[in-house]
Amino acid sequence: LGECEQYYKDRDFHFSRYEIALAYMALGGIPYYMDLLRNDRTLAENIDQIFFKNPQIKQEFEDVYMGLFSSSEKYVDIVVELGKHKYGMTRKEIADAVHTTSGGGLSTMLDNLQQSGIITTYPRLGGKRKVMVYQLVDFFSLFYLNYMHKHKTPTTGWGALQRSPQFFAWAGLTFEILVSQHIRQLQNALRIGTVTGMYNWRGMTDDGDGSQIDLVIEWHGERTDYLCEIKFSENVFAINADYKQALLDKISAFRESAQHIKSHSILLVMVTTMGVKRNVHSGCVNLEVTL
């Protein structure tokens, strides 16, 4: 993000950091698409021109995989399925979805996708055992699959879409991925030394509801677990009574889980686009990181 910010400054763009993040979430920092941006257009107008008014965009999506892999159709099938599951899929789930075996051929394709930076793997903890999950993290592919795959191209412009539930679902996921790709910067902001563990956590609250923590960072040197709630918002985010209770329930569920080392303290971190509004409910947040 820092490099993108400098790129825009050098070319006389005056995007806010919120817009720089949005551009990154759509274009993925790909130089080819960044070079198509014009500083006499708004970000919305630029995205309209690059994506929604570009009849070749489907071919460009397929060309990405044709240029990287032989048997590109099989790779595209995997990517399309992963695009339907925002928090990823296990190897068996992928094999079932693309109608193949969970053998060497699939392993090779998953390894190739991971080495190219299109997907990533991470441990999901909170159940009886650790599960490795494959997640699509290529921003261009996520944007294409969300808005244009199978003739989904919207008739309204990008500006209008930014008020839609579809936009906030896409933005919420891609902002989490954006944060995960800037872990070093997050560590620096939190003044964390050597990280001992980092993972997504799922568990159950006392009332039996499912609970998820977007990112857990373990720092054994300070005997502290940082529970990171990652929140995309176009404005300063206001925590209300219900949201505060949900956060406290997550902390309680994690504290009682097998993953939490009982001698460790817990710090709740809000990672947001625009910051957290100070109000009667925001005191539960121990640390805050913004763009």
Question: Over which residues does each language-model region extend?
Answer:
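Conserved catalytic cores of phosphodiester-cleaving nucleases, focusing on short active-site segments
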Residues: I183, I213-E234, L247, L268
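Domain-level recognition of nuclease-like catalytic cores that cleave nucleotide substrates
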Residues: K262-L291
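The alpha-helix within a helix-turn-helix
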Residues: E5, Y24, E93-D96
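Accessory nucleic acid-recognition modules appended to NTPase machines
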Residues: P31-Y33, L37-N39, L43-I213
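Mg2+/Mn2+-dependent nuclease catalytic core
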Residues: S233-A253
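Arginine/glycine-rich "motif VI" loop of SF2 helicases in the C-terminal RecA-like domain
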Residues: D249-H264
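Conserved small helical "lid"/interfacial subdomain of P-loop NTPases
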Residues: L1-E19
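The conserved phosphate-sensing helix
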Residues: F15-L36
